[in-house]
């Protein structure tokens, strides 16, 4: 929807985790101008979580919060496998809602002490600092300041790179979380070419992930992609090794992540009698 500077995504998935399985679909948008024009979130999502045995809709969930949490979790998983073990500093470029779950999730798997946050919107930066200053040594900074940290998460919708290769530390791990549509591009091409480059899904990242622009232009090809994060998680490929320098995780977000997150939320709600039961299909009467 270029006329509205936004887009919709329909994200269905079935997940078989062995001891449980589930299905679901998320209807979600990205409209960067929402906050300014309508006082609405940039991302608004709705998740329908279903029983795959009979297609019965078990729950309707807030897909916006679900997206925030699973995106932070995805970055944390990648950081766990690709960042240095003693990473104590985290840089974040983009101080919107995703920045909060980046810090919350990543700090659970690395001993983060120092946080540098960068955004063109000084009010967003101030809110972020106010939220976390009692837990971390957190301060505002430039994109260059943030990029010098042990771990960097970029969560912006830009189409012109904002992170240069020379800004990164020798062993910085970068979570490129912002690119989720064709044309978006946060990292300079030489960052991607110099790094151990890990993606979440080949079809999605080559079309709309961080690598979509250089891949489409032929600057980067399949030989430059180390592998998918799933291959590392299950042990098919190694994560960080002693020889690795900069590492990059290109995340577009997967529908199976939404189903997995919805499963956790649904099971917790069911066990603790949370939520609001209602007869959506008129079966109780």
Where are these regions (language model features)?
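Short helix-loop-beta connector
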Residues: 82-89, 111, 169-170
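NAD(P)-binding Rossmann-fold cofactor-contacting core
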Residues: 109-132
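Adenosine-phosphate binding glycine-rich loop
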Residues: 185-285
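Conserved beta-strand elements of the Class I
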Residues: 90-91, 247
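N-terminal ligand-binding/catalytic initiation module
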Residues: 1-66, 76, 86, 227, ...
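Glycine-rich Rossmann-fold phosphate-binding loop(s) that bind the pyrophosphate
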Residues: 94-96
């Amino acid at each position: 929807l270029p006329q509205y500077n936004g887009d919709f995504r329909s994200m269905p998935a079935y997940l078989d985790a062995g001891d449980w399985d589930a299905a679901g679909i998320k209807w979600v948008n990205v409209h960067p101008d929402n906050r300014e024009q309508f006082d609405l979130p940039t991302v608004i999502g709705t998740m329908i979580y279903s029983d795959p045995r009979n297609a019965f809709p078990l729950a309707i969930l807030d897909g916006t919060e679900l997206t925030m949490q699973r995106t932070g979790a995805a970055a944390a998983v990648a950081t766990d496998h690709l960042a240095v073990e003693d990473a104590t500093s985290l840089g974040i470029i983009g101080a919107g809602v995703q920045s909060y779950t980046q810090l919350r999730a990543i700090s659970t798997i690395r001993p983060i002490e120092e946080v540098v946050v960068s955004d063109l919107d000084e009010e967003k930066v101030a809110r972020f600092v106010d939220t976390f200053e009692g837990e971390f040594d957190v301060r505002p900074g430039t994109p260059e300041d943030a990029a010098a940290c042990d771990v960097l998460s970029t969560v912006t919708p830009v189409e012109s790179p904002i992170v240069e290769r020379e800004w990164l530390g020798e062993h910085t791990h970068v979570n490129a979380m912002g690119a989720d549509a064709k044309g978006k591009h946060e990292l300079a091409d030489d960052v991607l070419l110099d790094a151990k480059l890990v993606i979440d899904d080949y079809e999605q990242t080559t079309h709309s992930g961080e690598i979509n622009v250089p891949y489409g232009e032929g600057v980067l090809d399949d030989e430059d992609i180390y592998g998918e994060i799933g291959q590392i998680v299950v042990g098919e490929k190694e994560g960080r090794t002693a020889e690795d320098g900069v590492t990059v995780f290109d995340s577009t977000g997967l529908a199976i992540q939404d189903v997995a997150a919805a499963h956790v939320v649904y099971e917790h709600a069911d066990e603790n009698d949370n939520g609001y039961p209602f007869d959506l299909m008129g079966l109780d009467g």
